A protein has these predicted regions:
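Conserved beta-strand -> loop -> alpha-helix junction used to position metal-binding or nucleic-acid-contacting
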Residues: 234-235, 291, 296, 304-341
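Gly/Pro-rich turn-and-neighbor structural signature
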Residues: 92-112, 116, 188-287, 352-418, ...
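Short, flexible loop/hinge motifs at secondary-structure junctions
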Residues: 1-167, 236-237, 243, 294, ...
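Flexible loop/turn segments at secondary-structure boundaries
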Residues: 184-186, 215-217, 242-246, 267, ...
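Acidic/histidine-rich catalytic cores and adjacent linkers
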Residues: 297-299, 340-509
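Mobile genetic element proteins and their domesticated derivatives, centered on retroelements
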Residues: 36, 108-111, 145, 176, ...
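Short helix/loop capping segments that flank catalytic or ligand/cofactor-binding pockets
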Residues: 116-119, 153-156, 244-246, 268-270, ...
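Short, amphipathic alpha-helical "recognition" segments used to contact nucleic acids or chromatin
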Residues: 169-183
């Protein structure tokens, strides 16, 4: 074997080793994602051990030097003075109706006249009665005047109904929709439950028609929610895949449920059969001017460029953090240092939320504290990229490249106090659809995707506003047939909760 051949073999061996290492990293990352702990929380003591040998340029938010200073947390407010004691919920909810059962002792029942009552002992337990169907019969008496036999009789008109000549009522329709889109129960399961437990036969095809017509009735409310979300000039946006049935082929294709909304406000679901940049034209209208916060998917950049300077993209720190978290197995020390700097960024955000800081104060604090951490992170990432210490295709190399490619968008939140540090709030809104997708696997044809988007929008905004979706939908379905378009703004979940003085759920904030 010649020297040249030996060199080629050594290079090939080196390449194969690198490729094998990359494949092992990807396999380990996939195994952790499927079987491992889902939490991305960091252990402070573990990171301190890893960072003992890391030279740090100086403290971020604490005094001194070294890894202990780098890991020092920003001072938190005194919990004893700032945190409110949690309200202890009653063992049995006070609002429930009471069914009282009196149990008399046997000696008293045998001779009640010989006994005198001196007190009682009361105990309560929680009981449940299953839901039940009932036949709602509407009787409209006819009348004629006593002395005018030939006069036209009078009779009360039938109340307006969503579905004429249908047996469904607002209550039943609300129950079917809530069961599917809130409790993730497919129509075929509802069909089985109603028949086996109640002996009521409701074919799934009939229920599907009712759901479709209900979505059509709710479209004006959906459009009103969308209009209110877009008028704020700041939206968070993400998309999730959902399979739908391809007409005439019996096969499924991949569609996408795009989700966008404003933190602490409403959210909108939008159905498209792809995730191309052109889909965003149907989501953000031409007149929209403002900030769109999203992940690093290329379609967002292409769309923003097509709108010139009308749309500013803000990045998502959580996506960047997740990639470094997955790269810890490859080189724990370097990702650990980066992750802790990001932890300091999130600690600042937590303090701002605890103090209920407004947009101006948020921007000022971020400019004085968060920007310093971001600058340090940027210098470190550039140094790591220049050193070529990590292969570009490795988990760490990919994390570095992704962070640097998104850096300009990650800085946007520093100067605008309205913005969040990441896109997690809109991703949380998508989670219920993932649970439903596991149960019903795919939706009907593409048109069903649009109806699902409308109904998911209503259900999710009820949840965010602390409303019972069943009660809300039942009342709305009762009122809608008698309402005009200009009255729609008064029956959105937001307006409904405001009239009832309901505080939005903290989880949605």
């Amino acid at each position: 074997m010649s020297d040249a051949e030996a060199v080629l073999l050594l290079e090939e061996l080196k390449r194969l080793k690198q490729e094998n290492e990359l494949l092992r990293q990807k396999l380990d990352a996939l195994a952790r994602r499927i079987f491992g702990v889902k939490s991305e929380q960091l252990d402070k003591n573990q990171l301190l051990l890893l960072l003992q040998e890391v030279e740090t340029p100086g403290p971020v938010l604490g005094k001194g030097s070294g890894p202990e200073a780098e890991l020092a947390e920003p001072p938190r407010p005194n919990k004893a003075s700032s945190s409110k004691p949690r309200d202890r919920k009653p063992r049995l909810p006070e609002h429930l109706p009471v069914v009282e059962e009196v149990i008399e002792p046997e000696p008293f029942k045998a001779a009640p006249q010989e006994w005198r009552r001196i007190g009682e002992e009361v105990s309560e337990r929680l009981d449940y009665e299953p839901a039940k169907f009932l036949r709602r019969r509407t009787v409209r008496p006819k009348y004629v005047k006593r002395h005018e036999i030939d006069a036209v009789p009078v009779i009360a008109p039938l109340p307006n109904s969503l579905l004429e000549r249908s047996v469904v009522t607002p209550g039943l329709l609300a129950q079917i929709i809530v069961s599917k889109y809130c409790d993730h129960m497919p129509l075929y399961r509802q069909e089985s439950i109603y028949w086996s437990r109640h002996e009521v036969w409701l074919p799934r095809q009939t229920m599907a028609e009712w759901v479709g017509l209900a979505a059509d009735w709710l479209k004006p409310i959906y459009r009103q929610i969308r209009e209110e979300v877009l008028e704020g000039g700041y939206v968070q946006i993400d998309e999730t895949p959902i399979r739908y049935l391809e007409p005439g082929h019996g096969k499924t294709k991949l569609g996408y449920l795009w989700t966008y909304g404003t933190p602490k406000e409403d959210v909108v679901f939008h159905w498209e059969t792809s995730r191309a940049a052109a889909c965003l034209e149907n989501i953000l209208p031409v007149e929209f001017r403002g900030v769109a916060q999203c992940d690093g998917y290329q379609a967002y950049r292409s769309f923003a460029r097509s709108r010139d300077d009308a749309i500013v993209l803000a990045g998502c720190m959580a996506h960047v953090r997740r990639k470094f978290f997955e790269a810890q197995e490859q080189a724990p020390k370097v990702p650990g240092w980066i992750l802790w700097q990001m932890r300091n960024l999130y600690t600042i955000e937590s303090q701002l939320r605890e103090t209920r800081a407004g947009p101006n104060l948020r921007a000022a604090i971020r400019g004085s504290q968060s920007r310093m951490i971001m600058n340090r992170l940027h210098h470190t990432l550039i140094a790591l990229k220049t050193s070529r210490r990590f292969l570009p295709r490795s988990l760490m190399g990919a994390a570095i490249d992704y962070a640097l490619s998104q850096w300009s968008t990650l800085l946007v939140y520093l100067d605008d106090g309205r913005l969040e540090i990441d896109n997690n709030l809109i991703e949380n809104a998508i989670r219920p659809t993932a649970v439903g997708r596991k149960n019903w696997l795919f939706i009907g044809q593409a048109e069903a995707g649009e109806r699902s988007a409308i109904l998911y929008t209503i259900i999710e905004n009820c949840r965010r506003r602390g409303l019972d979706p069943f009660s809300y939908l039942k009342e709305v379905f009762t009122r809608l047939p008698s309402m005009t378009n200009w009255q729609v703004k008064d029956i959105t979940p937001k307006a409904w909760a405001r009239r009832q003085c309901i505080v939005p759920l903290q989880a949605a904030a």
